[in-house]
C-alpha cells in the first residue's frame, strides 16, 4: 500500500450512532474531488452522538478504516472527524477592530474574527467553528467580503459552534486507539451543506 499524501488525499470519518463510515477522497487537478475508498461498519458504542463504549466504537472505526484502505489501496494515517449530537451548541457573537491602513486587509479580518470568538464559552464546551455571517464597515452593513474596502472601523457578526469537551475527547480517544491522528473535528451538518449547497444557498440559510 502507498502512503496517503495530505496534499492529494482527504480522509473523513463519520461517527454515527448506527454506523461508522470512513471515506477516502482524492483531489484532482481540476479542483474536483473523487471518492476512491469507502468503509462502513455497524456501531453499537454510541448514543445520540456520544460515546458510551470506547472499545466497541474503536473496533468499529478500525473495521471501517480497514475497508476504506483496502478499496483505496492506501494507508490512512489521519482523518477529519464528523461530529454531531445533542451536545452541539450554537451562539452568536460580534467583534470590532480599527482598520489599520484605511483599507481592509487579511490581518484586519483575522483580528476581527479573533475578537468575535473571544467571548466566554462554557468550560465544558469546545469551540468547533467560527462562521462569519456579516461584516460592517463604518456602519455600512450587509458586507459579505470586506477585503480591499476602505474604512476605519470593521465589525464582524459570527456564529460560534461548540461541542461537549468530554464528548470530543472520548471520540478523539477512539480515533487515536484506532491508530489515526485527528486533523480536526467538523460539524456533520456543516460538512453536508458544503457538499450539496452553493455558497449563495448557504448565505440564504438553506
Mark where each language-model region is.
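Nucleotide/phosphate-binding catalytic cleft detector across ATP-hydrolyzing
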Residues: 1-17, 23-206
Amino acid at each position: 500500500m502507498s502512503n496517503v499524501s495530505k496534499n492529494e488525499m482527504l480522509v473523513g470519518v463519520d461517527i454515527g450512532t448506527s454506523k461508522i463510515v470512513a471515506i477516502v477522497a482524492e483531489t484532482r487537478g481540476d479542483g474536483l474531488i473523487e471518492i476512491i475508498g469507502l468503509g462502513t461498519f455497524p456501531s453499537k458504542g454510541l448514543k445520540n452522538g456520544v460515546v458510551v463504549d470506547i472499545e466497541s466504537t474503536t473496533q468499529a472505526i478500525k473495521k471501517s478504516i480497514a475497508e476504506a484502505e483496502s478499496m483505496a489501496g492506501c494507508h490512512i494515517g489521519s482523518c477529519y472527524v464528523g461530529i454531531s449530537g445533542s451536545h452541539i451548541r450554537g451562539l452568536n457573537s460580534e467583534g470590532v477592530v480599527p482598520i489599520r491602513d484605511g483599507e481592509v486587509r487579511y490581518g484586519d479580518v483575522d483580528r476581527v474574527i479573533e475578537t468575535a470568538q473571544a467571548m466566554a464559552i462554557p468550560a465544558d464546551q469546545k469551540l468547533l467553528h467560527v462562521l462569519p455571517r456579516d461584516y460592517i464597515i463604518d456602519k455600512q452593513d450587509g458586507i459579505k467580503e470586506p477585503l480591499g474596502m476602505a474604512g476605519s472601523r470593521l465589525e464582524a457578526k459570527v456564529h460560534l459552534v461548540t461541542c461537549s469537551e468530554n464528548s470530543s475527547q472520548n471520540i478523539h480517544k477512539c480515533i487515536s486507539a484506532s491508530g489515526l491522528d485527528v486533523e480536526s473535528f467538523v460539524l456533520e451538518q456543516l460538512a453536508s451543506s458544503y457538499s450539496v449547497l452553493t455558497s449563495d444557498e448557504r448565505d440564504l440559510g438553506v
